[in-house]
Structures are given as C-alpha cells and as structure tokens.
C-alpha cells in the first residue's frame, strides 16, 4: 500500500537490466511482473511479449509463471513510478539478451513518440480550425488570439485556390447547360416528324399499289368475259348454218 509519500527509484534495478520475475496479474493490454528486491511491479505490454503479434496476453502467460524480462523504461507520473519491461528482447529459456545494443527498443520508442506527436498535432489543428471566435464571430482562431479592434474589420480563414477551382468545376459539371437542351429537343422533334412522314408515304404508296392491283384484276376479268361472249356468238352462228 502507498503510505502517502512519493515513490522513489532507489530500490529499482538499473535501466536495461535483465532479471527473472513472477507474473502477478494478466490484463487485456499486458502482464504485471513482480520485481525481485522491491514491492514495485513492472508492466510488460502485449507489444513487448513476443516478436509476433499478441492479441490476448492470457494466451502467452499466466499468473505465477516465471519469465525473463528486461527493464526498458522508468518514468515518474503523478508521484508514481511506471516501470516498463520487455520479454521479446530476452531469450525465455536462458535469459540471454537478444538486443544487447538496445537497437530494437530505441526504434520502437522513436516510433511511439512520433505517432503521439502526429496525433496530438492533428487533433490540435482540427480543434483550432473548427473553433469560432467569441470576439469577432469568425472561424479559425480562439478569442485570446483575436486581434480585432471594436468596430474594426473581421478576418476569417480563406479557402485554398485549388479548393475553389475544384468546387467551381464540380458546380459547372453538375449544372445543366440551357443551350444544349433546346437543340436536343429540336433534333428529337425533327426525327419524329421524319419518321411520321416516312410512315405516311409508305402507307400512301401501299394504298396506291393495292388500288392499281385491283384495277388490273378487274380489267383482266372484263376482257376474259368479253372473249367468252364472242366465242359463244360464233358458235351459235355456225350452228344455224
């Protein structure tokens, strides 16, 4: 238990020391290891349990297991010491240091810091850009950073020229062209008229052809009937003679 006095690093092993400790507790994010010779426990984060990806620390270690660890970090936060340990840089069978020059540890620490800096900058910039000044009512800065004088002109963030060009292009592309629609309608109407004229001409020609055919048939029938009458008359004359 904490007696109320700030913790000290006097009884802790030196940085990059390798020792064997007992697993005191397993969580979703890592395992806490008892440090020999002191009451403090160190955390082995799941990213430092193995060189392979670890999703469940309980699949790697269990409470009471003895593991080899390397002390890779000590820091004081709110009068409490946080000790970081690593299992993957130590051979779990022999306790041999697999990263004697601490190259792996330094690379991961550098990567972690750059990631934290990037996310912090991104969040800060977005917060500032989306903030509306209470003093002038413009976006992009806080009231404490506002230089506007009472009755003076207001200044706000101006969008980039490229963004304006892209927006204008998209607007032009989306807007219908009034000059194109009438011409298209006229073309369609002309096509419809041509189609109708063709149909009417075809129907007229077919009607005329049918009429001429009927007339030809009628004349041929009349000529045949006249020939038959002539033959009958000739036959009657011969019979009288």
UniProtKB/Swiss-Prot annotation:
Region span, Disordered: 161-241
List of residues that carry Phosphoserine: 114, 183
Domain of life the protein comes from: Eukaryota
UniProt zinc finger (CCHC-type) residues: 131-148
Keyword Zinc: yes
Domain named S1 motif: residues: 16-88
Keyword terms, alphabetized: Acetylation, Metal-binding, Nucleus, Phosphoprotein, Ribonucleoprotein, Zinc, Zinc-finger
One GO MF term attached to the UniProt entry: zinc ion binding
GO cellular component: a single term: nucleolus
Disulfide linkage: none
Basic residues composition-biased segments: 182-198, 226-241
SMART domains to which the protein is assigned, alphabetical: S1
InterPro entries membership: NA-bd_OB-fold, S1_domain, ZCCHC17_S1, Znf_CCHC
GO biological process, one term: RNA stabilization
Residue numbers carrying N6-acetyllysine: 144
Basic and acidic residues biased stretches: 166-178, 211-225
Cellular compartments annotated: Nucleus, Nucleolus
Subunit and partners: Interacts with PNN. Associates with the 60S ribosomal subunit.
PANTHER family according to UniProt: NUCLEOLAR PROTEIN OF 40 KDA, ZINC FINGER CCHC DOMAIN-CONTAINING PROTEIN 17
Name this polypeptide is given: Zinc finger CCHC domain-containing protein 17
